[in-house]
Amino acid sequence: QDSVELDIKPEIEFVRKYIGSGSETGQLSVKFRVVDPVGNEIINRILNEDITKNIHIDNPQLWWPRGYGEQNLYTVSVDLVKNDGTVVDNWTRKIGLRTITMDRTKDKWGERFATCVNGVNIFAMGADYIPEDHLLGRVTPETTRTLLEKAVFANFNSIRVWGGGYYPDDWFYDMCDEMGLVVWQDFMFACAVYDLTPEFEANITAEFIDNLKRIRHHASLGLMCGNNEMEQFVKERNWVSKDSEVRDYIIMYERILPQIMKQYAPQVFYWPASPSSGGSFDDPRDENRGDVHYWDVWH
């Protein structure tokens, strides 16, 4: 690939807190910089007219999962600058240039469900990441790195953040970027049903948006999944005590979440549940479509 295009759209909030009266907002500009994986600054621009820009990177060094290529990471920095040169705010992150989606091509058995990175279907090898410790204060970057290094030693190239735990800290995703571990990220719902009251909807919507904005830039983020094991058991009427819980399930995972994903992380593949064949209670345990949980191996 000769070039890639980055869509740049900074969001500026609480301007008056930093520069005084609203009449001074025109004195702000946005400085955008990109440093390549070996440390060369390849882009340095001031975006002071239209801060929504398309930026081209020539001869991109792509990010790949472990075992398929290098984990090339670019450093992107956005500064909010006053006209006297004072930096009001800064956002700096590492990103990878890649495409990730799921190949669901129909085949003679049913339908594929393969992680496709940069047009190449990978053989995903990994396990669930559950809370490292019952006392979350004992989870540190060092403990997480030790665990993920063991995953790499076991030749993993993927890892699933289980929906019965919690959203990991930023360092987890940074390390997965660095180590080439593709992340299957569940939203934090598992093995239950929920009453979708207006208050609960407002609460979970804020949680969805906050976490998507926090992790969506990561090269390793391969998929967002609505929940763990709920589509199957709601279909089988396990845990369900009233019809409204089935209705609310559909609203949460097949309306609210897809809409939020489309708005805040349209480049990330969304899967409604695990296991699932694609949603709508369409035989979520079909072994020839989507993903399957096979319990017989340990029950």
Regions found by a protein language model. Give the residues of each.
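Secreted/periplasmic carbohydrate-active enzymes, especially glycoside hydrolases
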Residues: 1-158, 288
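Substrate-binding/catalytic cleft of secreted carbohydrate-active enzymes
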Residues: 158-178, 182-299
